[in-house]
């Protein structure tokens, strides 16, 4: 998508002159820009119902799903998935291609509405405003390739009324402070991924959702991203990392959930020395490989 200086000034001037319109679209912009997602529809789901369960430590869980289901034209893509994501951890959502991982993440970020089941965020039923506290990078980051890293972030902070000081903060977190006037279109794939994460961090999220962030990266890019993800829990950010690259996941995550055939076949702490590959294959064989 091409965006030049005139386009930016036109948008920003129009928003400044029409404060009523700014108020009306601000919530929608947050849903799109904070999460780093461009949605195909302007419709966002409303509040999702939540069923309480006894015996769970709610203070320790930032996100829970209960019997989450998604049906596409009569075929169950996600079937009664109940996740428990601990605060300030890195949670690996694993599964073969087509297992249902991306469908689950799209329900967590409001892109898809669950057919049934419930989602709870930070101790309350998930609602649209919670997207202000959730950052996400799903698929390729939405970048203006003819703008610099700083300018890409400036577009978002201006539209959303955020302090520009946050731009340098997130650029420092993702180690993109020295890119100067280099345009995003000239960035390596790893740099683009990190800029996408910077966009998702602008709202200081409590939860960061990353869908296959290392896809296509070279070994150096993977190592840089690994160290970045490892640093987030110390900053008070919980990470849900979706991936099928087991060797990489094993070096990053604290807990794992393994999806196969749309079913959660395993969830638990990843202990030192545990054979994740064998566990993964056992779950996949037991539950099948079909899914979305």
Regions found by a protein language model. Name each.
Residues 65, 154, 158, 164-179:
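Conserved ABC ATPase "signature" region
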Residues 117-132, 266-268:
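Conserved ABC transporter NBD signature motif
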Residues 208-212:
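Catalytic Walker B motif of ABC-type/P-loop ATPase nucleotide-binding domains
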Residues 222-235:
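Helical segment within the ABC ATPase nucleotide-binding domain
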Residues 109:
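Helix-to-loop junction immediately C-terminal to a conserved catalytic motif
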């Amino acid at each position: 998508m091409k965006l030049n200086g005139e386009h930016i000034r036109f948008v920003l001037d129009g928003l400044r002159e029409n404060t009523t319109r700014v108020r009306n679209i601000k919530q929608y912009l947050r849903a799109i820009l904070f999460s780093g997602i461009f949605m195909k529809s302007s419709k966002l789901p409303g509040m999702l119902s939540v069923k309480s369960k006894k015996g769970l430590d709610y203070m320790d869980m930032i996100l829970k799903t209960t019997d989450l289901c998604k049906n596409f034209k009569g075929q169950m893509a996600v079937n009664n998935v109940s996740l428990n994501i601990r605060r300030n951890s890195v949670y690996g959502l694993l599964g073969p291609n087509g297992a249902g991982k991306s469908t689950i993440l799209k329900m967590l970020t409001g892109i898809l509405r669950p057919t049934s089941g419930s989602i709870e965020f930070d101790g309350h039923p998930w609602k649209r405003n919670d997207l202000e506290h959730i950052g996400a990078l799903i698929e390729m980051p939405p970048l203006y390739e003819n703008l610099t890293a700083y300018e890409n972030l400036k577009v978002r902070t201006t539209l959303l009324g955020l302090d520009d000081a946050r731009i340098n903060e997130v650029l420092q977190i993702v180690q993109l402070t020295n890119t100067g006037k280099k345009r995003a279109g000239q960035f390596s794939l790893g740099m683009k991924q990190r800029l996408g994460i910077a966009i998702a961090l602008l709202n200081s999220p409590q939860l960061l959702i990353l869908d296959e962030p290392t896809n296509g990266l070279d070994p150096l890019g993977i190592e840089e991203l690994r160290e970045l993800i490892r640093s987030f829990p110390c900053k008070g950010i919980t990470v849900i990392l979706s991936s099928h690259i087991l060797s990489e996941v094993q070096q990053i995550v604290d807990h794992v959930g393994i999806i196969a055939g749309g079913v959660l076949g395993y969830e638990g702490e990843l202990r030192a020395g545990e054979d994740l590959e064998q566990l993964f294959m056992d779950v996949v064989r037991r539950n099948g490989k079909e899914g979305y």
